[in-house]
Regions:
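Structured helix-beta-strand junction loops
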Residues: 50, 104-105, 159
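Short beta->alpha linker loops
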Residues: 20, 47, 90-94, 114-115, ...
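Conserved phosphate-coupling serine/threonine residues in phosphotransfer and NTP-handling enzymes
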Residues: 13, 112-114
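Asp-based, Mg2+/Mn2+-dependent phosphohydrolase catalytic module
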Residues: 1-4, 116, 120-210
Length: 210
């Protein structure tokens, strides 16, 4: 079935914010704990895409649950400040131009496993707010990516969307939502048997014409 819309992931699909976020998290950990934990950008590529509490469980296992979740919240707060102030080009090549072109004929949405405010920050930083019809995240609903995809579908009366993401968890969320998955192979992870593959974001223009 021809797609009637495209739902997008952010990290590893639209941009790579890991160099900036690593610096932010390192400062937050140093200021809010005595843990000897330091993050490199690559470390975050292996963590992004998971729910934040799951990331906290992985990287701060020595802390009590309440403390580790408070620390990941501090990391996210510092991350927001660092990203807001950053002048680095974080978008993958061709993303802004492709989104602007696609949005003229195809409704575009974002569903990401992120904290509240992250998608809004992304849209503000990139100037793409007017191209995105709707978005959702666990920070807004408390739901996982699959249910959030379904929520966006129901809210916007979508019948045949495709989800574009970069890791196996994105494929699994698409399957949970009952929609096809397109793997952004330039991103952070490998995927088992995606329905579609793009090696540059601009390939969406020829792959899908809603």
């Amino acid at each position: 079935m021809k797609p009637d819309s495209i739902i997008l992931d952010i990290d590893g699909t639209l941009w790579n914010s890991t160099p900036v976020v690593a610096d932010a998290w390192n400062l937050a950990v140093a200021e809010n704990s005595s843990l000897p934990v330091r993050f490199a950008a690559y470390d975050l590529t292996q963590l992004f895409g998971r729910p934040l509490n799951a990331i906290a469980d992985l990287v701060f296992p020595s802390l009590e649950e309440k403390e580790r979740y408070a620390l990941i919240d501090a990391c996210c707060e510092q991350e927001h400040a660092f990203l807001s102030a950053s002048t680095q080009e974080l978008l993958y090549p061709g993303v802004a131009d492709t989104i602007r072109k696609l949005s003229k004929s195809c409704p575009l949405f974002i569903v990401s496993n992120c904290q509240s405010g992250y998608i809004e920050l992304f849209l503000e930083k990139t100037g793409l707010s007017d191209c995105i019809t709707d978005f959702e995240c666990p920070g807004g609903t408390g739901l996982g990516k699959g249910p959030n995809i379904r929520l966006v579908m129901e809210r916007n009366h979508l019948h045949a969307p495709v989800y574009v993401g970069d890791i196996e968890g994105d494929r699994m969320a698409s399957a949970e939502a009952g929609i096809p998955f397109c793997h952004a192979a330039y991103g952070f992870g490998s995927v088992e048997k995606p329905d579609y593959v793009i090696r540059e974001f601009s390939e969406l223009l020829t792959l899908f014409s809603c």
